[in-house]
Amino acid sequence: FPNSGINGLDRFLPLAIFAIVATDIALSALAYKFDIASTVRARAIVEPWTISIAAGALYFYSARDGLILSYVASLAAALLFALWPLWRSYGFAWGWRPSVKRSLVIAQRNLPLAAADAAEWGSRRLDLAILGLFASPAVVGIYYVAQQVASLPQKLKTSFDPILGPVITRNLQTRNYAEIAKQVGQVGFWIIAAQAGIALALGIPGEAVMGLMGPEFVGGTAALAFLLAAEVAAATAVVSESALVYMARHRNLLISIGMLAVQALVSVGLIMLVDDIPVQPEYVGLYQAAAVACGLMISLGIGSLIKSRLLSRLLGQPIRVWRWALLVAVAAAALLGMAIVSVPARLEWVELAIGVPAILGLYGWIIWRWGFGPEDRVLFRKKKD
């Protein structure tokens, strides 16, 4: 992608979109009733475990199509685990009749939100498309693997969406903008803290993490570091959008589209700069991959800054997502990580078996001890309710 051939069952892969859409609709309906467990079960447990098990089993059936089939199997499994609680919660839609007029009204009302989501999705695909125009398929494959590793912290934000939505809508009705700013700041800090911790744990021993896929993937470590940093940079935009979709949906959409243009320009510009760097020819593609990831990080960071400032202006309140404890935790985890990765190459397993838990443990302890206040801990307990 986009310069690889289409073979076998690749042609039928677009049909999987129906399972993706149906799952999203079912989980959204469950989130409306504060059923977060079903989302976690379908997205964080069933889907990844199904694709992992199916990939290992179907490899013996078809080395070429096995991964595609395992991906489709994971989508089907997630759909089943979303439909079952949906039926238990809502039952069957007896007496329902389709209405084209009503559907068009709903679609028109939600078009800015859907387009903003599409722009966010596109930002995670635009980098692959740009890289594919300049680099070989092998480099694109290495970048894709790094992208999948970096997508782990990205998935954290979805678990907080059902928390912010009701709080924002309720306080918008009463015009309690100070409470909205407070909640956005708190949840924003939670997401940034969680994503930064995972980014440190995966990024510092990045060579060992990428080496799990094979020695040829180690060259994607720089791209992995930039991609992990990009997810942290995007956290502020994520929580700001939770309120902007209600208060300024069209401006939010325009910012999202504008950031796609910024990403494309910066990424291509950085790739052009690689040509001016004295690099051995066999490493040019890896430098280009790092350049594309850096372009994504820059565009997401700019988007976060613009969206948070827009929301702050609309609310008339500052949005505080950063706390000093975060810097202390990052510095301490980084020092520990650098000490761990200094072990001899023959002990690389130590970086993963001991280093990753140690980095997460120290980082998490500092955040919990000095970053979280009583209100944060109370809100986490309320989340369970």
For the regions a protein language model found, what residue spans apply to each?
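Interfacial segments at transmembrane-helix termini and the short loops linking adjacent helices
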Residues: 1-13, 177, 202-232, 279-287
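Interhelical loop/hinge segments that connect adjacent transmembrane helices in multipass membrane
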Residues: 60, 64-71, 82-124, 163, ...
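Alpha-helical transmembrane segments of polytopic membrane transporters and translocases
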Residues: 111-112, 127-128, 141-158, 189-190, ...
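Helix-loop junctions and terminal segments of transmembrane helices
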Residues: 31-32, 146-188, 241-246
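Membrane-interface junctions at transmembrane-helix termini in multi-pass inner-membrane proteins
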Residues: 20-43, 225-259, 263, 311-318
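Interfacial/gating helices of multi-pass transporter permease domains
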Residues: 7-8, 68-69, 101-113, 131-150, ...
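Membrane-proximal transmembrane or re-entrant/amphipathic helices at the cytosolic face
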Residues: 318, 323, 338-385
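Hydrophobic alpha-helical transmembrane segments
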Residues: 11, 41-90, 150, 258-265, ...
